[in-house]
Design a protein with these regions (language model features):
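Extended acidic/polar, glycine-enriched regions
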Residues: 168-174, 238-327
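Extended substrate-binding grooves/exosites of carbohydrate-active enzymes
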Residues: 1-33, 150, 189, 313-635
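Beta-strand/loop-rich accessory regions of lumenal/periplasmic or secreted enzymes
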Residues: 80-82, 88-90, 183, 293, ...
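Surface beta-strand/loop "capping" patches
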Residues: 212-243, 607-650, 763
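Accessory beta-strand-rich segments of carbohydrate-active enzymes
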Residues: 2-16, 25-27, 32, 46-50, ...
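Short strand-turn-strand beta-turns centered on an Asx-Gly dipeptide
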Residues: 146-152, 259, 336, 657, ...
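An acidic-aromatic loop/edge-strand motif
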Residues: 78-107, 156-158, 166-231, 235, ...
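Short strand-edge motifs at loop-to-beta-strand transitions and within beta-strands
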Residues: 117-119, 160-164, 277-284, 921
Length: 929
């Protein structure tokens, strides 16, 4: 659509989404003898924030308009992240839910913030005298643009470029570019992604000049013949000429260089036209190439040089491409003739200091994490990313699902129910051009990237004729890639939209049933293993599905926690939904990453790295662990002397060679443990451990409600009595019995056996018919003084019954700490432990006291050593709300509930990783004295 004057009514008209905007084009760069023809407009802009359109400075775009009262703002950057408006995180609901009664395509005119931007610039010498355009790489959500008082254009779609021709509006010397950004428009109904809601110019802005003859659009169309050694190149170009110039007689020269620099092709490329507006280069066959894939992402540099009829070079375009072949055969996706497996993640663009306005360093770091952890695929959820990310995926062999900027789940998912009565875009004709334009804009920009194997029509937008039109666009324009859309699962009438059967969070048994039904389509999980908090348990059940050829992997949800730095109780902390005073919100549901918001890997990453490795390397890892564990031998306990028993009215004292213990009848257990004149180790007598702080997955499946009795039991056990079962100079054994305030009532015994050099502890839980599942069973003790270090022999990192295979067996050490889960929850468990040692240290980090615990009866145990109790973790909403106790809470466990990972809103952990309250459970260990 073209227009010479702007109209506010466009904001509510889904048929108006681009006014005077240039056609979308490939992301290629070009240069001339004068060098690069780009000029960045990033940096400081003048800025005014208005709470509504009525309050905006309506004439700020006039060339002589005063900017008094305007501030400065950084571009790129979100407006909310620079002190204006309201930061808001929300998942499914629309941001205005409960504040404004709206239906598509309308907006709340009195609650639509506006950002007014002004940038003055002088054209660089290299751009002067040429056709000059401006490119906005990303603006949320809708914007109008003026140059030197002239209306330039209007655009929606926050995540693809919007280019406008400025040539007719530029003047010598200083120029004034004005941009008016609106937070809400009809397009807002299509951008209901599960993320923080921002607006503003959040990606780069730059000017670019076109030579007299210019390659407007380029599609290399690189391919691979079935021999996997012969590459093909069939460029398609769209050319333009400046006023007074002519394309008549122009020529194109093509050079192809191998990764090492060797030139494989260097010759003129004849062009032909077919009346479509494109010209086509004569196809080229290149024998002896290396096929592109994850293991060898070989990229070849194609250089196209455009000359005019006189032979003068007009511009040179370099582009890196790989040669590969992708498609379906017998219902299986194949890359270069071999079945492909996606070991993928979903990735939002995110930085905790700047939101989605990320920089190159964020992308480089993410790519390093991908390569280090065997991640070979990424889905750009749920919008196209910055161009640099695609280049990095090309270079590193990361397979891509490139997803269009479309998500409207708030229009058909209400309180988790499917209710599409006013779903957009659906089959509404007034929305069709808008969503197809989003598909086209993504396709045209990204089509040359070798890494992209699949186009996605968007996310969670139900289905209908409009999304079918998107799919048809991809199929008609790019037969060399597949089309993905998960939403047809909810509306099978439009099953033809997707070439792939794609699901979210389907359970392994459901997938198995599909795979055994002789399906026509291959299966992927576009989202699975919801890594909210302490999660990612049970991944093995999905990996085992790879035995079915049509199961081709999935994409973990998701890569990085979405959280923002804010002022907290003790300084800077990461805030989540609701922390910024916004309502409505979905609180911490934004924290689902396999890395924390600061980019550090979560403890679960070692398991993802293991399961995303090759079967051969997993087998080698398992064999290495088995060998190391089998070779481990407990050292013999030292020879101990006779025991001295001191019988008091309230305490039973036991002293031996280098140690002294006290067992309290009143306290109900071990009240004191000292070694060789060292410090006191026991703060309060150990108790049966019956509760862990609920994980996000526990909460989601209702486990804390079903098993809440154990929280009270853990906090308020009753020592019913004691019995001294043996008392001699060789051995002392005392048993304590505990009852718990549960219905039905339950009990446990804690037995201490002292010998000349050791204290053995045996804990037994007595199962009761009708008792709910336990989260844990073991023994918990707090030290009087904090341990500076805990060392253990067993599995590395944080492990659970359903998340331990990626750990390595060995000797490990760490400072007792709470991992950086956004919301405190159970953490720090170490499975399959043989020994552990708590160390106290002086200021020089020298060990001053140590307490060692070893397994009993050759039976390993699990343990955690944390600075906080389960109750303290349960009560805190942020890590900085945890009290500084000055103690270490040591929990030794014989039974541990898994963490789960299928989803965080209803699915329980796998049955094998639950703890039945009707059965007996026990744990035994030995404390060296």
């Amino acid at each position: 659509m073209n227009a010479s004057h702007p109209e506010l009514k466009w904001l509510e008209d889904p048929r108006v989404f681009a006014v005077n905007r240039l056609d979308a084009h490939s992301d290629h760069t070009w240069y001339t003898e004068a060098g690069d023809l780009r000029q960045s407009l990033d940096g400081a802009w003048r800025f005014a924030y208005s709470a509504s359109p009525a309050a905006r400075p309506a004439d700020f775009w006039q060339p002589d308009a005063s900017l008094d009262g305007f501030d400065e703002i950084a571009v790129p950057g979100h407006i909310e992240m620079q002190g204006y408006g309201q930061i808001q995180y929300i998942n499914t609901m629309y941001p205005w839910d409960g504040r404004h009664a709206l239906r598509p395509p309308h907006i709340a005119w009195d609650d639509t913030p506006v950002g007014s931007y002004v940038k003055t610039f002088t054209l660089d010498q290299a751009l002067q005298g040429k056709r000059v355009c401006v490119s906005f790489q990303g603006v949320e959500r809708a914007f109008y643009c003026w140059c030197n008082g002239h209306f330039v254009g209007y655009s929606e779609d926050s995540f693809t470029p919007a280019d406008f021709d400025l040539t007719a509006f530029l003047q010598e010397g200083e120029n004034r570019l004005c941009v008016e950004v609106y937070k809400n428009c009809s397009g807002s109904w299509l951008e209901d992604q599960d993320f923080f809601r921002f607006f503003g110019i959040f990606r780069s802005v730059y000017l670019y000049a076109k030579p007299a003859l210019h390659i407007e659009d380029l599609w290399l169309q690189a391919g691979l013949e079935p021999d996997n050694t012969t590459g093909t190149l069939a460029p398609r170009l769209r050319l333009s000429a400046a006023e007074g110039a002519s394309l008549e007689g122009c020529t194109l020269h093509c050079t192809v260089a191998a990764p090492g620099g060797a030139v494989l092709w260097d010759a003129p490329m004849p062009l032909r036209a077919d009346g479509s507006g494109y010209v086509y280069g004569l196809p080229v066959r290149l024998p002896g190439i290396r096929k592109w894939d994850h293991s060898d992402p070989a990229l070849y540099t194609v250089t196209l040089t455009l000359r005019d009829a006189a032979g003068a070079v007009q511009e040179t375009v370099p582009y890196q491409t790989g040669f590969r072949r992708f498609g379906l055969r017998d219902g299986v996706m194949e890359l270069n003739g071999e079945r492909i497996i996606f070991n993928g993640v979903n990735r939002h663009e995110w930085n905790p200091a700047s939101g989605r306005a990320i920089g190159p360093e964020d992308m480089y770091r993410a790519m390093e994490t991908f390569r280090r952890n065997n991640i070979n695929a990424v889905r750009t959820c749920h919008y196209p990313d910055q161009t640099l990310w695609y280049e990095l995926c090309d270079q590193n062999g990361i397979y891509m699902i490139d997803e269009a900027n479309l998500e409207s789940h708030g229009s058909w998912q209400k309180m988790s129910a499917v209710e599409p009565s006013w779903n957009v875009p659906g089959s509404l004709p007034e929305w069709r051009d808008c969503v197809v334009d989003r598909a086209r804009s993504m396709f045209e920009r990204d089509k040359n990237h070798t890494a992209i194997l699949i186009w996605s029509c968007g996310n969670e937008s139900y289905a209908g004729e409009d999304i079918l039109a998107m799919s048809d666009f991809f199929h008609q324009n790019d037969p060399g890639r597949l089309v993905h859309y998960e939403g047809v699962f909810h509306c099978r009438a439009f099953d033809q939209i997707s070439d792939i059967e794609s699901r979210m969070y389907a359970k392994p048994d459901e997938i198995r049933a599909y795979l055994e039904s002789r399906p026509a389509k291959p299966f992927i999980l576009c989202e699975y293993m919801h890594d909210m908090g302490n999660s990612l348990g049970g991944m093995e059940s999905y990996i085992r599905l790879l035995e079915y050829p049509q199961y081709q992997g999935g994409f973990v949800w998701d890569y990085m926690d979405q959280a923002l730095w804010q002022a907290g109780v003790r300084g800077r902390r990461l805030g989540y939904g609701g922390d910024f005073g916004e309502r409505p919100t979905d609180y911490a549901f934004s924290a689902n990453g396999i890395v924390f918001a600061d980019g550090e890997e979560k403890p679960a990453m070692q398991d993802l790295r293991y399961w995303y490795d090759t079967p051969a390397r997993r087998a080698a890892h398992d064999a290495r662990n088995a060998k190391e564990a089998a070779a481990f031998r407990l050292p013999a306990l030292r020879a101990g002397g006779p025991l001295t028993v001191i019988e008091g009215d309230v305490n039973l004292g036991v002293e031996g060679d280098g140690f002294a213990l006290q067992f309290s009848y009143a306290e109900g257990g071990l009240a004191s443990l000292r070694k060789a004149g060292g410090p006191e180790w026991v703060w309060r007598a150990p108790r049966p451990a019956l509760w862990r702080a609920a994980t996000e997955n526990d909460k989601g499946c209702g486990f804390p409600v079903r098993s809440a009795a154990w929280m009270a039991a853990d906090a308020f056990p009753k020592a019913e009595g004691w019995q001294v079962e043996e008392k001699s100079s060789q051995q002392v054994r005392i048993r304590y019995t505990f009852s718990f305030p549960t219905v039905p009532g339950a009990s446990a015994d804690l037995t201490y056996t002292v010998t000349g050099s050791a204290l053995r502890v045996d804990a037994v839980y007595h199962g009761v018919p009708g008792a709910p599942e336990l989260p844990v069973f073991g023994v918990r003790m707090s030290t009087l003084h904090p341990a500076a270090r805990v060392c253990w022999t067993g599995l590395s990192g944080e492990t659970y019954p359903d998340r331990y295979k990626g750990a390595s067996f060995g000797r490990w050490a760490e400072t007792p700490h709470i991992p950086a889960y956004l919301v405190p929850q159970d953490c720090g468990v170490h499975m399959d432990t043989r020994t552990l040692t708590l160390e106290q240290q002086d200021a020089a980090c020298r060990t001053t006291a140590a307490l060692t615990v070893r397994m009993a009866d050759d039976t390993p145990f699990a343990f955690s050593a944390l600075p906080n109790t389960a109750q303290e973790l349960e009560s805190a909403a942020h890590r900085d709300e945890l009290p500084r106790t000055g103690r270490t809470v040591l929990t030794i466990m014989g039974a541990v509930r898994g963490v789960g990972g299928i989803d965080s809103w209803g699915t329980d952990v796998e049955p094998a990783c639950r703890i039945c309250g009707e059965e007996d459970h026990s744990v035994s260990f030995i404390v060296e004295l």
